[in-house]
């Protein structure tokens, strides 16, 4: 889908500004259409599954990806669905790494 998935998540330094609205628009266009930008602050996408067990298994897959990348999303697990929320806590907003991680999630979904 894009080359964002080939990049690495890189930690931000304190004081790094969050992405601008224009930068966010450029990055979001490279992700699956189900990703939503909320208040120019975070990304969200909900994934649906047949049951709780499959949803739980998916959180573990994404958890392994998060550990590998050193970038950790918020995940809300409920029956048959997982909502992933991404933003960079250190800068309280979106960074390139949030979009890189989202692209890696998209790639994981397509495999």
Swiss-Prot record:
InterPro entries: PCD_sf (IPR036428), Pterin-4-alpha-carb_dehyd (IPR050376), Pterin_deHydtase (IPR001533)
The keyword Lyase is annotated on this UniProt entry: yes
EC number: 4.2.1.96
Group of enzyme by EC: lyase
Molecular function terms from GO: 4-alpha-hydroxytetrahydrobiopterin dehydratase activity
GO terms (BP aspect): tetrahydrobiopterin biosynthetic process
Entry keyword set: Lyase
PANTHER family: PTERIN-4-ALPHA-CARBINOLAMINE DEHYDRATASE-RELATED
Protein name: Putative pterin-4-alpha-carbinolamine dehydratase
């Amino acid at each position: 889908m894009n080359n964002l998935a080939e990049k690495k998540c890189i930690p931000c330094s304190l004081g790094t500004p969050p992405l601008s609205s224009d930068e966010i628009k450029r990055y979001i266009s490279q992700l699956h259409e189900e990703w939503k930008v909320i208040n120019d602050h975070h990304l969200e996408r909900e994934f649906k599954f047949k049951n709780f067990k499959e949803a739980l298994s998916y959180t573990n897959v994404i958890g392994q990806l998060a550990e590998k990348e050193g970038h950790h999303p918020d995940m809300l697990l409920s029956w048959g669905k997982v909502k992933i929320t991404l933003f960079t806590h250190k800068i309280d907003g979106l960074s390139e790494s949030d979009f890189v991680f989202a692209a890696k999630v998209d790639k994981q979904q397509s495999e």
